[in-house]
Amino acid sequence: MKDSLVLLGRVPAHPDSRCWFLAWNPAGTLLASCGGDRRIRIWGTEGDSWICKSVLSEGHQRTVRKVAWSPCGNYLASASFDATTCIWKKNQDDFECVTTLEGHENEVKSVAWAPSGNLLATCSRDKSVWVWEVDEEDEYECVSVLNSHTQDVKHVVWHPSQELLASASYDDTVKLYREEEDDWVCCATLEGHESTVWSLAFDPSGQRLASCSDDRTVRIWRQYLPGNEQGVACSGSDPSWKCICTLSGFHSRTIYDIAWCQLTGALATACGDDAIRVFQEDPNSDPQQPTFSLTAHLHQAHSQDVNCVAWNPKEPGLLASCSDDGEVAFWKYQRPEGL
């Protein structure tokens, strides 16, 4: 099992600082990293080496917590502890901050683009989730402020093909939102984690959602539409989400991030025990009660907490990770034979 995750290289992405988050561009050719040094770095390959192509240092006054590429790949959004979100426009190797989104009362913890590229979501320690609309002139307007959580909101993620938004919070819940008559509403609350929910990832179909938590478990939730054959109760026309699998006993500390590979279906986790783990759904497992096996476990992936794992969207098995040690590492995952 140990050979199924092979190190390709490491870069000191944010020296003397934490590296908080990573995001691949849609083409899979560039990786954005962000950190406690207030900087964003853009990484690309030259030959077999990963090199820094750009440093975005002018946008933020405090830690940059998360970054996200627009679906077209021409824009990068960055969420910062300075309570702002910057929108950067890519022009060849250069990036220009074209807009700064203000409104959150304190630290912005996450930012995510909808698959259409016309909507952006942000969330904050102020307990709110904001939905922004983007028009043809690249003007951003807040169209909804959602106050469904009772604590710090850690992460937002969009469904891969629908305008359905999910958020994870310090209040131990996951919430889902959709648009209804020109406003956004909370359409589901997923309860079951016993501590902070740190991150979320939809599977390639969008029918399942994975969540990871300070309670050291991963939960897999499945969407059931009204009138479903399984007889899962739904309220009105809203789908119901039910926990169909819990991965427990694998992680010894907080699970900070989870990534669901859109190409292979492999599930990777970033953990406070300095390790990276990869899980695969077992062949012939029951869709209503799936089982997953641990197929890779790298104990010392980094020298400190692993904060993020990110699968490349185009190259199967290429995984990037980052850590409190300031480094970004690149890995090749190969599914073990016989699984």
UniProtKB/Swiss-Prot annotation:
GO BP: chromosome segregation; iron-sulfur cluster assembly; protein maturation; regulation of transcription by RNA polymerase II
Effect of substituting H251L: In MMDS10; likely pathogenic; affects the interaction with components of cytosolic [4Fe-4S] assembly targeting complex; decreased interaction with CIAO2B and MMS19; loss of interaction with ERCC2 and POLD1; decreased interaction with HSC20
Compartmental location: Cytoplasm
GO CC annotation terms, alphabetical: cytoplasm; cytosolic [4Fe-4S] assembly targeting complex; MMXD complex
Residue spans of the WD repeats: 14-53, 59-98, 103-142, 148-187, 192-231, 250-289, 301-339
Motif residue range(s): LYR motif: 176-178
Keywords associated with the record: Chromosome partition, Cytoplasm, Disease variant, Repeat, WD repeat
Documented effect of changing D171G: In MMDS10; likely pathogenic; affects the interaction with components of cytosolic [4Fe-4S] assembly targeting complex; decreased interaction with CIAO2B and MMS19; loss of interaction with ERCC2 and POLD1; decreased interaction with HSC20
Result for mutant: H302P: In MMDS10; pathogenic; affects the interaction with components of cytosolic [4Fe-4S] assembly targeting complex; loss of interaction with CIAO2B and MMS19; loss of interaction with ERCC2 and POLD1; loss of interaction with HSC20
Principal location class: cytoplasm
InterPro entries linked: CIAO1/Cia1, WD40/YVTN_repeat-like_dom_sf, WD40_repeat_CS, WD40_repeat_dom_sf, WD40_rpt
Similarity comment: Belongs to the WD repeat CIA1 family.
Alphabetized PANTHER family for the sequence: CYTOSOLIC IRON-SULFUR PROTEIN ASSEMBLY PROTEIN CIAO1-RELATED, WD40 PROTEIN CIAO1
Function recorded in the entry: Key component of the cytosolic iron-sulfur protein assembly (CIA) complex, a multiprotein complex that mediates the incorporation of iron-sulfur cluster into extramitochondrial Fe/S proteins. As a CIA complex component, interacts specifically with CIAO2A or CIAO2B and MMS19 to assist different branches of iron-sulfur protein assembly, depending of its interactors. The complex CIAO1:CIAO2B:MMS19 binds to and facilitates the assembly of most cytosolic-nuclear Fe/S proteins. CIAO1:CIAO2A specifically matures ACO1 and stabilizes IREB2.
Associated disease: Multiple mitochondrial dysfunctions syndrome 10: An autosomal recessive disorder characterized by proximal and axial muscle weakness, fluctuating creatine kinase elevation, and respiratory insufficiency. Additional features include learning difficulties and neurobehavioral comorbidities. Some affected individuals have mild normocytic to macrocytic anemia. Brain imaging shows increased iron deposition in deep brain nuclei in some patients.
Subunit field text: Component of the CIA complex. Interacts with CIAO2A and forms a complex with CIAO2B and MMS19; the interactions with CIAO2A and CIAO2B are mutually exclusive. Interacts with CHD1L, ERCC2, IREB2 and POLD1. Component of the MMXD complex, which includes CIAO1, ERCC2, CIAO2B, MMS19 and SLC25A5. Interacts with WT1. Interacts with CIAO3. Interacts (via LYR motif) with HSC20.
Record's miscellaneous remark: 'Ciao' means 'bridge' in Chinese.
Annotated protein name in UniProt: Probable cytosolic iron-sulfur protein assembly protein CIAO1
Organism: Homo sapiens
Lineage summary: Eukaryota, Metazoa, Chordata, Craniata, Vertebrata
Gene: CIAO1
